[in-house]
A protein has these predicted regions:
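Active-site hotspot residues in diverse enzymes, especially metal/ion-binding acidic/histidine motifs
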Residues: 1-193
């Protein structure tokens, strides 16, 4: 949306224009972009991980200025999506040990997690020799001075809305403790008078 594109599900497109829906479906089972109308559409029946990747893949085509389909452009769009969803530096600071960690922390498919982790290992070797200008800029952008740490994940607590940083938990520490306390509090107590 930031780039002026509207995002629709395939069902939304079908409700608006059956012909465009058929074109989307024939073009891709996952997602489609229509540059002239500034539209990205995706199949809402895919997994949430696949949807996120597909939308970022289409955004990659847009950001990289791709005007035609070819294998090289597809590789570039995949690389873009992978790095947007699981930046290699963020994989490092999240201390991911394998592709399952990457998939879990960054909410991407196992296949995407495997690709990202393999690429991370190459990045790590390169970064050990020399930190690139891009890496320095990324570090500055995601480093939180007050927290004194690199931030790779920000989300609100599902109960109180407090900001949770760098955690796979959906509840803040206070709400988790309250939840545990309630689970272990007896419904009634007996009195021995």
């Amino acid at each position: 949306r930031h780039y002026g594109y509207r995002i629709f599900t395939y069902q939304n497109i079908r409700d608006i224009n059956e012909r465009l829906y058929q074109y989307c479906r024939n073009y891709s089972e996952d997602a489609f972009r229509y540059g002239a109308k500034r539209i990205i559409a995706y199949d809402e029946n895919k997994s949430p991980f696949r949807i996120r990747f597909s939308i970022m893949h289409e955004l990659g085509h847009i950001m990289l200025g791709h005007s035609r389909e070819c294998a090289y452009n597809e590789q570039q769009a995949n690389f873009f999506a992978s790095n947007i969803l699981a930046p290699r530096m963020a994989i490092h600071f999240a201390q991911c040990r394998n592709e399952d960690d990457v998939s879990s922390v960054f909410q991407i498919s196992r296949e995407a997690g495997s690709y990202a982790f393999q690429n991370y290992r190459l990045w790590k070797e390169s970064a050990a020799r020399e930190v690139s200008d891009v890496d320095e800029a990324m570090y500055r952008h995601f480093y939180h001075d007050e927290r004194e740490e690199f931030i790779y994940s920000i989300k609100p607590c599902m109960i109180c809305g407090e900001t949770i940083y760098n955690s796979s938990e959906d509840l803040c520490l206070h709400c988790r403790m309250e939840h545990i306390r309630r689970q272990h509090t007896p419904l009634y107590t007996s009195r021995n008078d």
